[in-house]
Curated annotation (Swiss-Prot):
This is Neuroendocrine convertase 1. It holds the Pfam family Peptidase_S8. It catalyses: Release of protein hormones, neuropeptides and renin from their precursors, generally by hydrolysis of -Lys-Arg-|- bonds. It comes from Rattus norvegicus. GO terms for biological process: insulin processing; neurogenesis; pancreas development; peptide biosynthetic process; peptide hormone processing; pituitary gland development; positive regulation of protein secretion; protein autoprocessing. The lineage of its organism: Eukaryota, Metazoa, Chordata, Craniata, Vertebrata.
Length: 752
């Protein structure tokens, strides 16, 4: 009897478990606002039922006759519970044979599961492509990749998109490129033939174009080199740099086969010597204009440009008319440490950033190389632009109807500032967008860009408008050393006219400035919304007396703002060279934008924690603006803010002021630990490091020296804050604590 009772209990328990499991499965279902029904009588009967019962008739289900799909007019899009009452009412209709509410079904692709990104491809250098995959050993480290793999996992790999590389040629028979080579996207303007093959020489001087093309379209899973960002795209090469370059050659290259080529990638420009001011000639400018108007069947060619490698020479890409063009997407670089590399230039025209080389300890970029070889040492902004071009190819596969301006909006709206947040110079513009003269709107995020470009939800941006503001009564204004010229520019942004602008894109300030030493000029423009932008920073090597003649200084920093109000132009010379003199001859402000706000901008930009910065992979809390007080001239010159003979009370006062500015405790700990573990060898090893101390004023002076000038927001009294490079030690660095330690030791040495 007991045995029978036990059996009944077990059976009951089993049935209960099965019932719970079934209900659990059912509970996990997500029911959608769609009903399938079998109805005889054709579409007329289905339409009548829909109208009577409050449905929208979505149509016949596939090729199944008498089967229709309905959507209820007053039901949520998704629900965890089925709407039994709605289903019953539909089923009770005599004309309905069968009805069922639809629910989401989980389906998985029956492909072999991958253990990790390391196993995605058999290409031998794939594991070295740190910028395309998450190579972290622990989740506590920040992600470094461009978020490309999630796009590939959707099957988006660049199919149907054509990119051409304007450079010194393309080794098109390279076994990692040949399968994706497109002869219709290729030409040799140096020798005027259809073969862009590079000229070999003993130094492999003409490897540049092949390396850039490899980044974009190296074939996947062919046991050769690495993997291109858009590894199923088609790539061509324009050979135009290996010989005499003329305006005609540039125009022919920029405008080559615009009905076939989608994206043009260029990693070149005028000399990055810190003293050149040059842009496209008349013909090249017309080629750009033709490309955006007629290219890609009227949707506009996509021009991707490297922002320049003149950082060591103090160059400024605002003096490069190619990156400064409204028609190009100017791409800067970030190192593996998430920092602005030594070669990078600053300017207000840079739109976004991708990864490239940094210090000698950082990994570089992998690609194909001459003589059917491979390389892991591709460097500079030359390597950043092709990565961006590859990402844009992924977006064009996802949505071929994107216009050239759509692409720029997508870049602005999805680039991430957080991975680069430990760099100085970030500011929020009047539209709530984070922007930086070193990085534009931040690091490219391929997944976010492609997701936003989804043709099911993306709406092409409104028609572009142009509004020109100028003062016909303006009289030339004189400028001398240690002087300034301020021009107030009130505008209604062509309000009430067909070309009225309510949402900004690019802003151009076209000016003629005569000056005895061009490199001493500093130009800022403050928008009606209060965003201050450095249009031109000093260039020590630029001693030219030629000034600027009708030069377009371009900025993207006010993107999304309403331009109505008063803008302020300020031109200064703080060099102290008393012999300097000149004048502002004429100017005009050119606003580019739209009369109505683009659809995707009607809600504020939301920044995510993707690729969160953690102080160069050290797990230290993120730096914030240490202080917000205005800089003194000493701070702008990189000098210590407290002289050697300062009293302790003055040091204490300054420390109290900085505590109110919320200095980072993590930085203090980092300085202390760095000093402790790197003390001179004469210190006894028996003394515990915890007993070592750094003078409190030394800690704060190090913080000031490293952060104060460069962390300040732009204001009338901090024109130079975005361009002070004290933060980036000129000596090779490995991690942030090395630079902090170096600054601290410099301070202590000065005191001893």
């Amino acid at each position: 009897m007991k045995q029978r009772g036990w059996t009944l209990q077990c059976t009951a328990f089993t049935l209960f478990c099965v019932w719970c499991a079934l209900n659990s499965v059912k509970a996990k279902r997500q029911f959608v606002n769609e009903w399938a029904a079998e109805i005889h009588g054709g579409p007329e009967a289905a339409s009548a039922i829909a109208e009577e019962l409050g449905y929208d008739l979505l149509g016949q289900i596939g090729s199944l006759e008498n089967h229709y799909l309905f959507k209820h007019k007053n039901h949520p899009r998704r629900s965890r519970r089925s709407a039994l009452h709605i289903t019953k009412r539909l089923s009770d209709d005599d004309r309905v044979i069968w009805a069922e509410q639809q629910y989401e079904k989980e389906r998985r692709k029956r492909s072999v599961p991958r253990d990790s990104a390391l196993n995605l491809f058999n290409d031998p250098m794939w594991n070295q492509q740190w910028y395309l995959q998450d190579t972290r050993m622990t989740a506590s480290l920040p992600k470094l990749d461009l978020h490309v793999i999630p796009v590939w996992q959707k099957g988006i790999t660049g199919k149907g998109v054509v990119i051409t590389v304007l450079d010194d040629g393309l080794e098109w028979n390279h076994t990692d490129i040949y399968a994706n080579y497109d002869p219709e996207a290729s030409y040799d303007f140096n020798d005027n033939d259809h073969d862009p093959f590079p000229r070999y020489d003993p130094t492999n001087e003409n490897k540049h174009g092949t390396r850039c093309a490899g980044e974009i379209a190296m074939q996947a899973n062919n046991h050769k080199c690495g993997v291109g960002v858009a590894y199923n795209s088609k790539v061509g090469g324009i050979r135009m740099l290996d010989g005499i370059v003329t305006d005609a050659i540039e125009a022919s290259s920029i405008g080559f086969n615009p009905g076939h080529v989608d994206i043009y990638s260029a990693s070149w420009g005028p000399n990055d010597d810190g003293k050149t001011v040059e842009g496209p000639g008349r013909l090249a400018q017309k080629a750009f204009e033709y490309g955006v108007k007629q290219g890609r069947q009227g949707k506009g060619s996509i021009f991707v440009w490297a922002s320049g490698n003149g950082g060591r020479q103090g160059d400024n890409c605002d003096c490069d008319g190619y990156t400064d063009s409204i028609y190009t997407i100017s791409i800067s670089s970030a190192s593996q440490q998430g920092l602005s590399p030594w070669y990078a230039e600053k300017c207000s025209s840079t739109l976004a950033t991708s990864y490239s080389s940094g210090d000698y300890t950082d990994q570089r970029i992998t690609s194909a190389d001459l003589h059917n070889d491979c390389t892991e040492t591709h460097t500079g902004t030359s390597a950043s632009a092709p990565l961006a071009a590859g990402i844009f190819a992924l977006a064009l596969e996802a949505n071929p109807n994107l216009t050239w301006r759509d692409m720029q909006h997508l870049v602005v709206w999805t680039s991430e500032y957080d991975p680069l947040a430990n760099n100085p110079g970030w500011k929020k513009n009047g539209a709530g967008l984070m922007v930086n003269s070193r990085f534009g709107f931040g690091l490219l995020n391929a997944k976010a860009l492609v997701d936003l470009a989804d043709p099911r939800t993306w709406r092409n941006v409104p028609e572009k408008k142009e509004c020109i503001i100028k003062d016909n009564n303006f009289e030339p204004r004189a400028l001398k050393a240690n002087g300034e010229v301020i021009v107030e520019i009130p505008t209604r942004a062509c309000e009430g006219q067909e070309n009225a602008i309510n949402s900004l894109e690019h802003v151009q300030f076209e000016a003629t400035i005569e000056y005895s030493r061009r490199g001493d000029l500093h130009v800022t423009l403050t928008s009606a919304a209060g965003t201050s932008t450095v249009l031109l920073a000093e260039r020590e090597r630029d001693t030219s007396p030629n000034g600027f003649k009708n030069w377009d200084f371009m900025s993207v920093h006010t993107w999304g703002e309403n331009p109505v109000g008063t803008w302020t132009l300020k031109v200064t010379d703080m060099s102290g060279r008393m012999q300097n003199e000149g004048r502002i001859v004429n100017w005009k402000l050119i606003l580019h934008g739209t009369s109505s706000q683009p659809e995707h901008m009607k809600q504020p930009r939301v920044y995510t924690s993707y690729n969160t910065v953690q102080n160069d992979r050290r797990g230290v809390e993120k730096m914030v603006n240490v202080v917000e007080e205005k800089p003194t001239q000493n701070s702008l010159n990189g000098n210590l803010l407290v002289p050697k003979n300062s009293s302790s009370s003055s040091v204490e006062d300054r420390r109290d002021e900085q505590v109110q500015g919320a200095p980072s405790k993590a930085m203090l700990r980092l300085l202390q630990s760095a000093f402790s573990k790197n003390t001179p060898s004469k210190q006894s090893s028996k003394i515990p490091s915890a007993k070592l101390s750094v003078p409190y004023e030394g800690l704060y002076e190090a913080l000031e020296k490293l952060n104060k000038p460069s962390q300040l927001e732009d204001s009338e009294d901090s024109l130079y804050s975005d361009y002070v490079d004290v933060f980036y030690n000129t000596k090779p660095y490995k991690h942030r604590d090395d630079r902090l330690l170096q600054a601290l030791m410099d301070i202590l040495n000065e005191k001893n």
